[in-house]
Amino acid sequence: MLTFLKTLFQPKQTNAALAWAAIQNKAGNKATSGYWLYAAPVHLVLQRDSFSLGAPAPLTLEADEIQALTNALNLHFNQDTGENNVQFFWHENVLFLRLDTNPNITTNAPQAALNKDINAFLPKGEGAIKWAKFTNEVQMLLFEHPVNLAREANKQATINSAWCYGLGKIE
């Protein structure tokens, strides 16, 4: 009975990231097997004792910003191994993340957390602690990235995190 009630009240997971990956895979493009998520570039706002997710989410980026951030993230997460265990892809104004291994998390779309304390909306599950470390690493890389320094100088919201959601697997 509890399982049935959870299905009624828990937010549905969006699998559009998986759908995009499947289409790309069939077309012979970038999508490869693995675990796929959206990775929405967002701006977290420091509140008195928490962070909230600032609107809009995802942030709108220029092509040069997208390219620079995607390159920096991919270089950082794959520099030690030379493998592509973690890959960020930008396609039609949407950022995707592909992982080799299941992160074992459940996620929420950023729209659910807009202008709210994000703690209730952060990924949950067996892999949540490891995921928090990964997210923190992304945030540290973004903090002083030249794209964000330029955005800050232009009085634009900085991209200080990636909100990942919509987990799905491609075989």
Language-model features: where?
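Extended, Lys/Arg-enriched charged tracts that mediate electrostatic binding to polyanionic substrates
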Residues: 58-88, 145-161
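Loop-centered beta-sheet repeat module
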Residues: 101-170
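Glycine-rich, often proline-containing surface loops adjacent to acidic residues and nearby aromatics
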Residues: 44-57, 94-95, 113-121
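Short, glycine/charge-rich beta-strand/loop segments that flank catalytic centers
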Residues: 85-98
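An N-terminal, globular interaction/scaffold subdomain
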Residues: 1-66
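Soluble secreted/lumenal catalytic domains
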Residues: 28, 33-34, 50, 63-69, ...
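Broad, structure-driven detector of short, well-ordered beta-strand segments within folded domains
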Residues: 42-46, 162, 171
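Secondary-structure transition/turn motif
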Residues: 56, 98-103
